[in-house]
């Protein structure tokens, strides 16, 4: 049976976020090294604050890396090879936070249970 729904337009993606998860007691040093390498190799990326306390839907300490669409094809493979055992969630920014963090997400490493109920849902037009 063929699905008659229109395909989603990738042009709605405004950019991407990568959330790098770490444990403050045991893996923050690796997260710091990764962060420094991202800053050096991808100056177009914007590094967010360190969040040792839980924030939003995230079940573990993390920092965010925001990056433009043009960087996706380079930064994602780089993270695959250089994440040093850290878990990374990569998702698009379409305006639908719930779906971006769930159905549209790519996980590198262990998939963590997000608290999706705190995210805004935006119906697709």
Regions found by a protein language model. Give the residues of each.
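Long, contiguous binding/interaction regions
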Residues: 1-125
């Amino acid at each position: 049976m063929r699905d008659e729904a229109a395909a989603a337009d990738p042009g709605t993606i405004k950019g991407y976020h990568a959330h790098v998860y770490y444990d403050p007691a045991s893996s923050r040093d690796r997260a710091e090294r990764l962060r420094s390498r991202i800053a050096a190799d991808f100056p177009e990326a914007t590094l967010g604050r360190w969040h040792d306390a839980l924030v939003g839907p995230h079940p573990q300490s993390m920092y965010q890396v925001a990056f433009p669409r043009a960087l996706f094809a380079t930064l994602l493979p780089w993270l695959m090879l250089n994440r040093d055992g850290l878990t990374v969630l990569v998702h698009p920014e379409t305006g639908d936070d719930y779906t971006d963090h769930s159905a549209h997400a790519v996980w590198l490493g262990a998939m963590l249970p997000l608290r999706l109920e705190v995210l805004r849902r935006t119906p697709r037009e």
